[in-house]
Amino acid sequence: MAAPFHTVLIANRGEIACRVIRTCRRLGIRTVAVYSEADADAQHVRLADCAYPIGGPRPQDSYLRGEAILEAARASGAQAIHPGYGFLSENAAFARACAEAGIAFIGPRPQSIEAMGSKAAAKALMEKHGVPLVPGYHGEDQDGAFLAERAQATGFPLMIKAAAGGGGKGMRIVREAREFADALASAQREAQSGFGDARMILERYVEHPRHIEFQVFGDAHGHVIHLNERECSAQRRYQKVLEETPSPFLTPQRRAAMGAAAVAAAKAVDYVGAGTVEFIVGQDGSFFFMEMNTRLQVEHPVTEMTLGLDLVEWQLRVAAGEPLPLAQQDIRARGHAIELRLYAEDPQQGFLPGSGRLERLRLPAPSAQVRVDAGVAEGDTVTIFYDPMIAKLIVHDADRDLALQRMREALATCEVVGPKSNVEFLERLVRHPAVTEGRIDTGYLDRHLDEFLPGDGEDDRAALFAAAVACLLDEEAAAQAQAARNGDPHSPWARADGWRLGHAGKRVIALDGRGGRHTVDAHGHAGRYALASDGIACMVEGARLDGEALSARFDGVGRRWRATRHGNRVAVHDGTRRHGFAHAPAFAFEAGAGDAGDRVVAPMPGRIVLVKAEVGVVVQEGDELLVMEAMKMELTLRAPRGGTVEAVQAAPGEFVEADAVLVRLAEA
């Protein structure tokens, strides 16, 4: 079959740009990338056949500059532009500009984007077509006092949502009327910053709902079908964490009803291309239209894995005027697929986005059952300007239980050194009963977050001894290698066993874990050690380290661990949990906390959007002092203790670096 286009420009970055390039390459299509100053060495730039610079690192200076992207398309001879997701993917003006330039926009018609791009307008349209809606307000009057009245009429709990937004940006849950004004102002700021549109809609908040969406596809010949559902109920801060298909909640009858509603929604706007109709689903099975995303979704790979399709190829062919490759009756799903999003973020700090160089990155080996969609590689930098996703991990197997087990095995091979990551959080997620039993709802993670975090409890003793053995073997191997380079491989000084004249041969391994510092006394050499820590002894025999595979007998019981080391970090994984330690000098003292409680510092680079702190004002612990924007999210910085504001060293609009002191406190 002939390629639908000879040259396609991808107006995006990261993993989605890389993913589109792979399909184009398979079809023999020449690819053109665009990049910001921050992405000059990014993977999508390296993968494309050619690449054009389009501006500064901030999205509004590059990936949101439609004219710069069109200029790159004209210069490169691109026949079509694939927008990916985010950025300009749901921008009707850009889609229209592409058409006027004679360049195909690989997405829906501009009027379809406009109809569904405003949540308020979309809800009005769905209301006309009989699609169930959650009670609320989606009108044009955006006066604050009027919205407060509509909120009171709708009732609490209430959801405030950006009319033109998505992805959790500009969204707040309000449980009491007195919280409404502050929540509205914060959501409006976030929406204005993220989408250039501060309009809000109000909805009655459905308690403990599920989030289930349907993939739809239409062509220019009037055909519209759905490609089954994806359940995305596992969310944190309104961001999807785990997506799967089929949904463990839907019955065949519910699936048929929701699928028909999704197709009706798409037909209502003469939809062409890939889209997703999202529903809120109550615990009783009732469902309500939430929004339609007029683009390819991040989680589309689970649909591809169960159907054996390439949705990007479908997008390309439909954009070229071809009919849909399959009819509704031809859609046959096979097995179960799950996707997880691996992020540079700190779950223990409210999922604070991270940034920095990926000093070490290990991801699962791709196979027929395991897929990895990544936009970065080891040595790349996760920047502060964009979403901190590292990779998407997708698995497929015959049923849900097998798919979950395959995902656990895939996660066990992951390692991220550099910025903090959510890999350990994901490991706990796929073992949690709420997930394995298929009963999670959209608010479960936020309500029970402590169940998914490691906490500050005692370190596992077996893991501590395994980490110590890994350090011992690593030191011995390094000493032997050095001796060989020196031409004396049999020197007793190269044994790294602690032997010295007049010395008993004890080595001390100091490891910092969640439970504090541990010292492990070790006697022995070459895989046979007598270990002791905090009065507990362990005899280790037959220890070997083959690459990252550590095997040994601990007090006669054979164990196998995955052990990795990078710099002073050592991590061991027993197949169920990972345990990380910092290998410290055995007799080093820990630094004290100093005056950390007297300062409020920037947790990461970002822009100050609001300053509430005033010099001389007495504040209480937890009071809101500043709001900053980083990684496209608003972060509220609060007083670490009660006191008097002594100094304010930040102003709205100012860009600050990580660890910059923003507020100083004195005693009240």
Residue ranges with predicted function:
Residues 589-668:
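Structured functional modules or segments
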Residues 171-173, 204, 250, 389-398, ...:
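Short, well-ordered beta-strand elements within core beta-sheets of diverse protein domains
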Residues 176, 218-223, 282-285, 365-366, ...:
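Short acidic-glycine loop/turn motifs at beta-strand connectors
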